[in-house]
Amino acid sequence: MLVDAGFNDLMRPAMYGSYHHISALAAEGRSLEHAPTVETVVAGPLCESGDVFTQQEGGNVETRALPEVKAGDYLVLHDTGAYGASMSSNYNSRPLLPEVLFDNGQARLIRRRQTIEELLALELL
């Protein structure tokens, strides 16, 4: 499954195979709780073979049992910690992603998405 995020947003799986639990959320509120699961490789849109979130140290790709999702649904990569933001970059001219903190079950936006204007503001030519 290809997702909007890439290793420029979360470098740790590509660097050293860090494991992050992945769960799915349906966009329009349908329940995925009892949906059948499919063995899934989760990868990003970058033009690099290492842009895979479900890999072990050394680059061995693994699958995760995830419910079938549709375009527009969300995947949550859990436990990314403080290093997600500090290790992220604008590689391939991609804006920085927003970050959400789950605090006692409540989602809180702690970093908004970078705009294209902000991304290009440092360019001189």
Regions of interest found by a model, annotated:
Residues 1-125:
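Charged (often Lys/Glu-rich) extended helix/loop segments that serve as interaction or gating elements
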